[in-house]
Curated annotation (Swiss-Prot):
Ranges in a coiled coil: none
Binding site for NAD(+): A4, V5, H6, F7, G8, A9, G10, N11, I12, G13, R14, G15
SUPFAM superfamilies in UniProt: 6-phosphogluconate dehydrogenase C-terminal domain-like, NAD(P)-binding Rossmann-fold domains
GO CC annotation terms, alphabetical: cytosol
InterPro entries per the UniProt record, alphabetical: 6-PGluconate_DH-like_C_sf, 6PGD_dom2, Mannitol_1_phos_5_DH, Mannitol_DH, Mannitol_DH_C, Mannitol_DH_CS, Mannitol_DH_N, NAD(P)-bd_dom_sf
Catalysed reactions, as listed in the record: D-mannitol 1-phosphate + NAD(+) = beta-D-fructose 6-phosphate + NADH + H(+)
Subunit comment: Monomer.
Biological source species: Streptococcus mutans serotype c (strain ATCC 700610 / UA159)
Gene it is expressed from: mtlD
Keyword set, alphabetical order: NAD, Oxidoreductase
Lineage: Bacteria, Bacillati, Bacillota, Bacilli, Lactobacillales
Protein name in the entry: Mannitol-1-phosphate 5-dehydrogenase
Record-stated family: Belongs to the mannitol dehydrogenase family.
Length: 382
C-alpha cells in the first residue's frame, strides 16, 4: 500500500486531505502534537467523516496512524524517509516549525539512497505555501542534502477549498465537512508527476486558481463574518439571512470578479456561477459556522497581501471600483471579540494611536490616498 505523511491531524487534515489520500489508496501517518487525537488514531486506525447534506452520508477513512512529533520526532523523520507523498494542513504560521523534521527526513532519504521522487504539498490558506515551506526546509539541509532535495524533492504549490467549521464531538476523530471540495496542485514544481491523485486538479500555472479561491472564498467568507458581526449575527448562516449582509457579500464578489477578469481573463459567466456556488456553500443549513471563527485574527486579515488589501490595491492600480471592499475593511476595524487575541490587540492599538497610524501599521500600505480612504471609511461607521 502507498504511504503518505500528513502534518496536521486537525479537522481539515482529517476531513479533507485525509479523505482524498485514503480514496487514492494511501495508508496515512498523521503527524500532530495533540495527544488525544494521535492516541485515538493509533488505537482505532480509522475515523468517520460526515458530509453536511441531506442524508448526512458517512465516509470511513481507514489505514491511518498517528505520530506525536513533539514526543517522537525520530518516528516522523523515519516516516518522511520512506513515504511516497507528504501533505500539510497545519496553518501558515506553523509551517516553519515542521521544516527541520522534514529536512532531517530528506537527509535520511539521501543517506539511504532513496531516490524515489517525493512531492511535499502544503495545503494551506496562503499563496505559495509549498514554496514557503521549501525556503524554511533549506535552512536545515546540508550542502549534500540541498543538492539531493533539488534533484528528488518537489514542493508544488496548491490551492485548497473546503469549509470545515469549528466543532466538538464526543469522538475526537469524528469530523463534519461540507460536500464541496477543491484541491488544485501546480505541476511545474512536481518531481513525481506520475503520482496524480483522483479528485485533485493539476494545473501548469496555479496562480489564477489560488487568487480566484483566496479572493472569492476567503474574501467572501470574511466579508460575511465581519459584516454579519457588525449587524449582530452570531453565525454565517444567520448573517446571510440579513439582506444587507448578503448584498454586501454579493457586491464584494462583484468587485473581485472585475479584478479576476482583468488580471487572469476568467470569463464573467464562469465566475458568476463560481460565486453563486460560494454563497450557497456559506448558506448550507447543515453547517453551523460561528462568525467568531471566520472573523478571528483580524490583524492578519488586514495584511498587505491578504484577502482585502491586496484586491483593493490591484483594483485601484487598474482603475476599477473597490467601494464595497473598502466598506468591509471598515467593518473589520470595528470588529470586537474579547476572546480573540488579535481583536483585543487591534482595539488596544486604536486606543493608543491615531486611526491613520494603525491603518498604516496593520495594512503595510504606503499609498497616502488609499490610507486616507480607509480612514474615512472606518470613521463613517463611528
Amino acid at each position: 500500500m502507498k504511504k503518505a505523511v500528513h502534518f496536521g491531524a486537525g479537522n481539515i487534515g482529517r476531513g479533507f486531505i485525509g479523505q482524498i489520500l485514503f480514496e487514492n489508496g494511501f495508508a496515512i501517518d498523521f503527524v500532530d502534537v495533540n495527544d488525544k487525537i494521535i492516541n485515538a488514531l493509533n488505537e482505532r486506525h480509522s475515523y468517520d467523516i460526515e458530509i453536511a447534506e441531506d442524508g448526512k452520508r458517512h465516509i470511513t477513512v481507514s489505514n491511518v496512524a498517528g505520530i506525536n512529533n513533539k514526543e517522537n520526532p525520530q518516528a516522523v523523520i523515519d516516516a518522511v524517509a520512506e513515504t511516497e507523498l507528504i501533505t500539510t494542513a497545519i496553518g501558515p504560521n506553523i509551517l516553519p516549525f515542521i521544516a527541520q523534521l522534514i529536512a532531517k527526513g530528506i537527509e535520511k532519504r539521501r543517506e539511504s539512497q532513496n531516490q524515489t521522487p517525493l512531492d511535499i504539498i502544503a495545503c494551506e490558506n496562503m499563496i505559495g505555501g509549498s514554496a514557503f515551506l521549501w525556503q524554511e526546509v533549506q535552512k536545515y539541509l546540508s550542502a549534500d542534502g540541498l543538492a539531493f532535495a533539488k534533484d528528488y524533492i518537489g514542493f508544488p504549490n496548491a490551492a485548497v477549498d473546503r469549509i470545515v467549521p469549528a466543532q466538538v464531538h464526543e469522538d475526537p476523530l469524528f469530523v463534519v465537512v461540507e460536500p464541496f471540495s477543491e484541491w488544485v496542485v501546480e505541476t511545474a514544481a512536481m518531481k513525481n508527476p506520475d503520482l496524480k491523485l483522483s479528485s485533485v486538479h493539476y494545473e501548469e500555472n496555479l496562480e489564477p486558481f489560488i487568487e480566484r479561491k483566496l479572493f472569492s472564498v476567503n474574501s467572501g467568507h470574511a466579508t460575511t463574518a465581519y459584516t454579519g458581526a457588525y449587524f449582530g449575527a452570531k453565525t454565517v448562516l444567520e448573517a446571510l439571512k440579513d439582506q444587507q449582509v448578503k448584498e454586501q457579500v454579493k457586491a464584494v464578489l462583484g468587485e473581485i470578479r472585475q479584478l479576476l477578469m482583468a488580471k487572469w481573463q476568467f470569463k464573467e459567466n464562469d465566475l458568476k456561477v463560481y460565486h453563486d456556488i460560494i454563497i450557497s456553500r456559506f448558506e448550507n443549513p447543515y453547517i453551523v459556522d460561528d462568525v467568531t471563527r471566520v472573523a478571528r485574527t483580524p490583524i492578519r486579515k488586514l495584511g498587505y497581501d491578504e484577502r482585502f488589501i491586496r484586491p483593493i490595491r490591484e483594483l485601484k492600480d487598474r482603475g476599477l471600483s473597490y467601494e464595497y471592499l473598502l466598506q468591509t475593511v471598515a467593518y473589520v476595524f470595528h470588529y470586537k471579540d474579547s476572546n480573540d487575541e488579535q481583536s483585543v490587540q487591534l482595539k488596544l492599538l486604536l486606543q493608543e494611536k491615531s486611526l491613520k497610524a494603525v491603518v498604516k501599521e496593520v495594512t503595510g500600505l504606503t499609498d497616502a490616498a488609499l490610507i486616507e480612504e480607509i480612514v474615512t471609511s472606518v470613521e463613517s461607521l463611528d
